[in-house]
Amino acid sequence: MAKAPITDKRKPAQNGLFSAEKLYLLRSSFARIDAQSEIAGLMFYQKLFTLEPSLQPLFHTSIDLQTRKLMNSLHYIVATIENPNLLTPALEAMGRRHVAYGVRKPHYELAIRALLETFGQILGDGFSPDIHEVWREALCFVAESMKNHRN
């Protein structure tokens, strides 16, 4: 999957979800997170399983494979977030798969929390309140789209 391009802050946003500035913050911060993708993925799962140990048995593949799947999903989300007509059906399909794995609606907030904590650790002082907020908005959009899948 292609890396998400860095958006010019001056270019107008093409949707109502995020301003061009927010897209820039999302994509530029993700580029820094992606540079440490293996660490970020492992850190995320460690945090998730610490928050809710009962989730660990839902994962039937190696943590390395899960990490790659997570980062590939984040790549796609970051690359397509300005096109909800493309992104939403993919998220709904992912939501259906996650239901089959045993994921329930309350688990999404735990995943958001674990991701935000992970991003904060990876980015350090670079995880500004604005970057935190844009990631929270993006992850909430992702979670809502996944939870609202059509059976």
Sequence positions of predicted segments:
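Globin-like tetrapyrrole-binding proteins
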Residues: 2-151
